[in-house]
Every structure is written in C-alpha cells, then in structure tokens.
C-alpha cells in the first residue's frame, strides 16, 4: 500500500473528485502542498470550489486527463473498472488507491486521529466534537458526512495535529482507517445488502476497534447489547464508557424545553459536573453529546468550553431541521432512514408542540426495507399519520421484489393510519388538503424527500426558517 507523508508531497489525481468526501481530501492535500488534479462527469458547486483554489478539474472524464507526472491515482467506489481514466492509469502502471485507503493514510499524519463510528449519529456527534475542539482553540482538521454550519460545509482544514472524521462501516471501509481514538455510538442491523447479519456487523466493529494502537482509546456506549464483546482482548488500550448505569459519563435530571431541547446534569465518574443545555432536540442527542464530552475531557478540554460549545451547536443539515411553516403547520426535515433513527426522531417530535404528527417517509434502498420491514412498521406507528413515498433505490436494483405498498399493507394490518402515495406532486397535494394548522409534518429519509418540504415552502404564503 502506498504511504502518504505530508513532508513528501506527491502529484495525486482524483477520479471522481466532485464527491463530497473526495473533494475534501483533495483540499486537505492541496493545503499540504501536494499537486492535485481531478476529474468528474460534470461540473458542480464542489468542482467549481476546487478550481477556485487552483485545482485543475477535468470535465468530462477521459484517458487524456491522466497527465505525465501523476504519481498516485485515487478513485471512489462509484468508478467502474471500465472507466477510461481507470484503464489508462492501470495501463501506465501508476499506483492506485481507494478513497477509504487515502483517508486512512492521511490520518496517519496526525498525532490524534478521532474516528466516530456507529450505525447512526455519526455526523451529529462528529460535528459536536468539532464544535468543542474549535471552542477550545485546538484548530482541528474536520471531515464530516453532512453540512456543519459553523464551518460552512463538510470540511475544515486546520494546522494542529488533531484529525476528526466519521468512520462508516459500510463495505468495511473503516478497516482502512488508523484511529487513535475510536468512538462507538451504537451497533445495529443495517447495510444488509453487504453484511450477512448482525453478528457480521458486530465483528466488523470489533475489527475496527482492534485497529487502535496499544496506547489508543475506545469511547463506547455502555448501552450497546453485550458491549463487553467489543472490549475483549484490547491489551493496554484505554476504555471510557458513556450511557446509563455505572458508565463513566452519564446524564441525570433530564428536562426538555418547549422545542424538545434537553438539559441535563452531567456526571463524570460519579461526580456532578453541572448542567449542560443542548440546542438540538431529542434524547438521542443527550447520548451523542456524552460521547463528545468523553472525548473532549480525555483531551484535557475544560467543562466551560464543552458546555459553551454544546449549547451553541445547533445541529447539522437534515437532522431535525426546522424548515418553515405553511398554512399554519410546521415542516421539519430529518435524515432518519433506519428504524432506530426514526423512533428517536419521532420521540423528539412528540415533545415538540403540535396537534397531529405527520411523517412523510421515503424508504431508502430495497434491501434495507425488506430486511427491516417489521421494525419500520413499529417505529413509524408512533406517529399519528404516515405517508409513504416510493422507495429510494440509491445504488440498488429491485431484485427482492418489494415496494412501499408492502410496508403500507403491513402497517394497515396493525391498525396504523398510513397512505402510500408514490410521487411527490401527489404527496404535496394531499398534504395541502389534509394537514391542518398546528400540525407538525416531518419529511424523513436519506433520499430526496427533502424536496417535498422545499416545494411546499416555495408556495405563496409560506414562511421559511432563517
């Protein structure tokens, strides 16, 4: 495997440089005086941003884009082996590396590499940790899987020896990483188009933890079923727990304001450390914040900086994001696409002022919908009214013969108020006819369901959130 050393800059060419992760890695390397070029199928705001920094971006992709002098080529999983540039790089014998491998090699250049892993909560928790590090003037480099408001995007290039990133389990990509601190938020069944079952997922997380160096740290949710399994045979690696019971970091005396934003008393190793007030909603974010606090305290950050940063942190794009109002009802958008995430979002919404709670849910991938259908039905049933859109295919073809109507039939058999409306214009028409003043409507899913709320808020009389 090709090593990346910041003190030995190379010429690196990115095939698919316009992706949110690839563009961030390109920017980090440019800051470290690497020569960076790249290509993509079309221009985008991200490619235009890279060009404004001085990176040559070729559109479209072509074998002629592989110039003499390129020393390493990086590609994404979306690039097929019959891609012209991929073929030309192979023909020339230029070393190649996947995006995940490059990310892992980059983090080896930092003394402290913090990786946040878990079935859900990664983007929010990574952003919370980033907010705390910035409040404490630690000048971190941050790469996150969503839009973090205080850095104006998904990337912050710092000059310190701290690197912060999400670590995704899909296709075992986090097995390419080299963390010194690993955060494990939760471990549940997901990505069942790749993993065989929950046991294979658990083994994948265990392998990730074992990538820590002997003096590394794992911060783990004590509420994960059989969490002790992940801590077996860790040698001298340090362990910090958060959650309930006798965890090292716990939240007690929890209360919520009018908008479901929690406050709690923080206990560290059983000692009362005072009140923490969050500006994000829901019980799940209490436990996300506990993991962030644990990391920050390990790095020697004061409670004052931690509390200030967490109070200021208002969330990331598409995480219980208040979008606006129309006809007197409120529209919120949320990325939840796993049953546990849906349950957490609905639990937060129940604490939010409303008459009726409506969920407009777009299932994400056929394999996930089929494998977790019973769980989806149970989670969604906690709302008053549910509208199901067509399944968002993402990377899949419908080889399992399933549709949102199958989920509707299951939910109807359980006496849930549910409607299957395939297309967005019909969904929007139904909403305008049936959702009333004082209701709360959440567009939910990891696909393009956000467009429903955007369309409604573009109508005359709508009020957008600032």
Language-model segment annotations:
Residues 68-72, 161, 437-439:
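Short acidic/histidine-rich motifs immediately flanking catalytic phosphotransfer sites
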Residues 5, 28, 34, 51, ...:
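Phosphate-binding loop of NTP-binding sites
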Residues 12-17, 444:
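Conserved N-terminal Rossmann-fold NAD(P)-binding element of oxidoreductases
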Residues 39-40, 58-61, 97-104, 143-146, ...:
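Beta-strand->loop->alpha-helix junctions that form or flank phosphate-binding loops
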Residues 377-437:
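C-terminal helical cap/extension that packs against the catalytic core
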Residues 2-13, 21, 25-32, 110, ...:
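Nucleotide phosphate-binding/pyrophosphate-handling subdomain across enzymes
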Residues 35-38, 141, 387, 419:
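Conserved beta-strand positions in the Rossmann-like core of class I SAM-dependent methyltransferases
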Residues 33-49:
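NAD(P)-binding Rossmann-fold cofactor-contacting core
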């Amino acid at each position: 495997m090709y090593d990346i050393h910041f003190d030995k800059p190379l010429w690196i060419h990115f095939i698919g440089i316009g992706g949110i992760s690839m563009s961030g890695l390109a920017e980090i390397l440019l800051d470290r005086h690497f020569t960076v070029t790249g290509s993509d199928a079309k221009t985008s705001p991200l490619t235009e941003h890279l060009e404004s920094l001085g990176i040559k971006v070729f559109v479209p992709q072509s074998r002629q884009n592989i110039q003499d002098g390129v020393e390493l080529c990086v590609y994404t999983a979306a690039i097929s082996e019959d891609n012209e540039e991929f073929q030309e790089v192979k023909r020339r014998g230029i070393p190649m590396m996947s995006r995940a491998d490059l990310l892992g090699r980059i983090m080896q250049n930092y003394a402290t590499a913090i990786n946040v892993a878990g079935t859900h909560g990664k983007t929010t928790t990574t952003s919370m940790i980033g907010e705390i590090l910035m409040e404490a003037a630690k000048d971190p480099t941050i790469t996150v899987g969503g839009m973090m408001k205080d850095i104006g995007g998904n990337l912050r290039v710092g000059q310190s020896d701290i690197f912060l990133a999400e670590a995704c389990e899909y296709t075992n990509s986090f097995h390419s990483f080299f963390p010194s601190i690993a955060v494990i938020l939760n471990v549940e069944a997901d990505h069942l188009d790749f993993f065989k079952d929950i046991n294979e997922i658990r083994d994948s997380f265990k392998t990730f933890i074992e990538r820590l160096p002997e003096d590394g740290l794992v911060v783990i949710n004590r509420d994960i079923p059989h969490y002790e399994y992940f801590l077996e045979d860790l040698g001298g690696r340090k362990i910090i727990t958060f959650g309930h019971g006798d965890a090292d970091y716990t939240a007690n005396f929890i209360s919520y304001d009018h908008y479901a934003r929690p406050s709690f008393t923080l206990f560290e190793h059983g000692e009362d450390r005072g009140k923490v007030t969050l500006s994000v909603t829901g019980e799940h974010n209490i436990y996300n914040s506990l993991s962030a606090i644990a990391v920050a305290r390990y790095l020697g950050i004061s409670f004052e900086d931690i509390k200030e940063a967490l109070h200021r942190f208002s969330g990331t794009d598409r995480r219980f994001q208040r979008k606006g109002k129309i006809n007197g009802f409120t529209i919120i958008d949320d990325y939840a696409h796993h049953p546990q995430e849906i349950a957490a979002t609905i639990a937060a919404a129940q604490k939010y002022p409303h008459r009726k709670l409506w969920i407009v849910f777009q299932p994400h991938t056929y394999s996930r919908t089929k494998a977790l259908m019973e769980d989806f039905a149970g989670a969604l049933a906690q709302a008053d009214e549910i509208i199901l859109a067509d399944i968002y295919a993402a990377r899949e073809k419908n080889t399992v013969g399933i549709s949102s109507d199958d989920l509707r039939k299951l939910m109807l058999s359980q006496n849930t108020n549910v409607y299957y409306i395939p297309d967005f214009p019909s969904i929007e028409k139904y909403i305008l006819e049936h959702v009333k003043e004082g209701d709360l409507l959440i567009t939910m899913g990891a696909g393009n369901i956000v467009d429903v709320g955007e369309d409604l808020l573009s109508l005359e009389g709508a009020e957008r959130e600032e």
